[in-house]
């Protein structure tokens, strides 16, 4: 059973991804998955109990949610295929005891492995420390802390791209011509991606008016583009269980892939469908050959 019909380019389920993956989606139906999970206690997207972002206890509620999540993800991923999880470490506030960091990266790795996925690698995505200091107002990055007491100073928080692989043999090799050149791979094989443009997001690219719903912390399009080209073939299904406004689908469709997503928040779901429709129109327009064009008028 397939996620999408033969002529269907994309679809987004409106609802909680966890029961949808565990009970409703066909098993082994996803060719590649890339997403940014909600960050517990850091960003709250909805008031719903199903929203992982509303979990206050990293070792309690968030861990339970994510353990079921990874079980569902392992169920729908095809054998031998990859999933990349975009995370960052989460600042621990005074109400949690000492100021420091929650190891969100490690939590995702442990729960992914426990669900049966094979942890293979993670890339680091460089962040601008000055921009992060201004945006987060973190004393640990600011000059005030540097010049008063350096005991608690730390560097900025990078992003991590955690790569898992479903156990088993991959039946269809990912070997499409022209997707990734040798020169690109020389750059992308670096352990730290320092050339990702932080502002190249769907918020900036497509949110043209106040009526357009913007995501709180969207994943950069450069990251998605690289991963989609690396780990999927044209025509295959890319899955994002936390679709947001559709960043992963937007890039996937423009790269000739198909997309399936889940989104809990109504406003994000509606905006995602708009963005995906535009991406598909753009891809179709760019795919037209000279022979498809209307004949010139003499």
Q: Positions of the model-derived regions?
A:
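Class I S-adenosyl-L-methionine-dependent methyltransferase module
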Residues: 107-108, 271-298
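Core catalytic lobe of class I
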Residues: 1-271, 298
């Amino acid at each position: 059973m397939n996620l999408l019909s033969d002529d269907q380019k994309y679809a987004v389920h409106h609802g909680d991804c966890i029961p949808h993956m565990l009970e409703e989606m066909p098993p082994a139906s996803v060719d590649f998955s890339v997403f940014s999970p909600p960050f517990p206690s850091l960003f709250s997207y909805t008031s719903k109990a199903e929203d992982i972002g509303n979990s206050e206890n990293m070792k309690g509620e968030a861990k339970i949610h994510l353990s079921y999540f990874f079980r569902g993800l392992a169920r729908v991923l095809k054998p031998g295929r990859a999933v990349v999880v975009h995370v960052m470490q989460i600042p621990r506030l005074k109400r949690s005891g000492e100021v420091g960091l929650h190891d969100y990266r490690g939590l995702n790795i442990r729960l992914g492995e426990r669900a049966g996925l094979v942890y293979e690698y993670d890339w680091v995505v460089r962040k601008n420390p000055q921009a992060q200091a201004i945006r987060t107002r973190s004393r640990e990055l600011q000059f005030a802390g540097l010049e008063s007491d350096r005991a608690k100073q730390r560097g900025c928080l990078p992003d991590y791209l955690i790569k898992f692989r479903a156990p088993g043999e991959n039946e269809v090799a990912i070997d499409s011509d022209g997707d990734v050149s040798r020169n690109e791979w020389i750059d992308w094989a670096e352990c730290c991606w320092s050339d990702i443009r932080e502002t190249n997001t769907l918020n900036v690219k497509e949110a043209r008016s106040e009526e357009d719903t913007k995501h709180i912390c969207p994943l950069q399009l450069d990251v998605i583009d690289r991963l989609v080209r690396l780990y999927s073939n044209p025509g295959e299904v890319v899955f994002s269980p936390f679709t947001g406004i559709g960043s992963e689908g937007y890039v996937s469709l423009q790269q000739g892939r198909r997309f399936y997503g889940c989104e809990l928040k109504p406003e994000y779901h509606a905006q995602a469908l708009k963005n995906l429709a535009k991406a598909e129109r753009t891809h179709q327009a760019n795919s037209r050959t000279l022979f498809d064009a209307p004949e010139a008028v003499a």
